[in-house]
Structures are given as structure tokens and as C-alpha cells.
Amino acid sequence: MSNLRLTIAVFLAALFQTLWWKPRGKRPQSNFHAKRIRTVLQTLLVMLCTDYRCDKGLCKCHGFGGEKENPTAAPLTA
């Protein structure tokens, strides 16, 4: 299972680097395009998260992998 987590982490890092890398001479991405990419990445991270909690409008992931029914993350502190 550790290899799968490592593979997913490397894939997301490569995807993130590819989407935001700008070669010299290229025009910057439009705001709409950047917002769409950010939304897709956030959606992927939420799908991979097994313990997603929101507190006072701030949502955070508290664990990747493992059982969704039995999260092993620490409790949310204020």
C-alpha cells in the first residue's frame, strides 16, 4: 500500500509541476484556466482524502489512505 501512496504522490507532484511550469516566451495562463486547474486539483485531493473535516468554513484533509469508515487521523483542534 505504501507504493501506491508514493505513486499517487509522485503523480500529483508531476501534474502540479507540469500545470504551473511556464517556459520563457510563453504567455501567462488566463485567470479562468488557472482557476479551472485549481478546481480540478482540489477535487482530486478531496476524492483521495479519507478524513475530510470542515470547521468554521475552513476545510482540511486529516488523512490519506486507509479505511474511510475508520479514520486514523488526530482530532481537529481549535
UniProtKB/Swiss-Prot annotation:
UniProt keyword terms in alphabetical order: Antimicrobial, Fungicide, Plant defense, Secreted, Signal
One annotated GO biological process: defense response to fungus
Domain of life: Eukaryota
Location in or out of the cell: Secreted
GO CC terms, sorted: extracellular region
Position of the signal peptide: 1-21
Primary location: secreted
Family: Belongs to the DEFL family.
Protein name: Putative defensin-like protein 288
Source species of the chain: Arabidopsis thaliana
Upper classification of the organism: Eukaryota, Viridiplantae, Streptophyta, Embryophyta, Tracheophyta
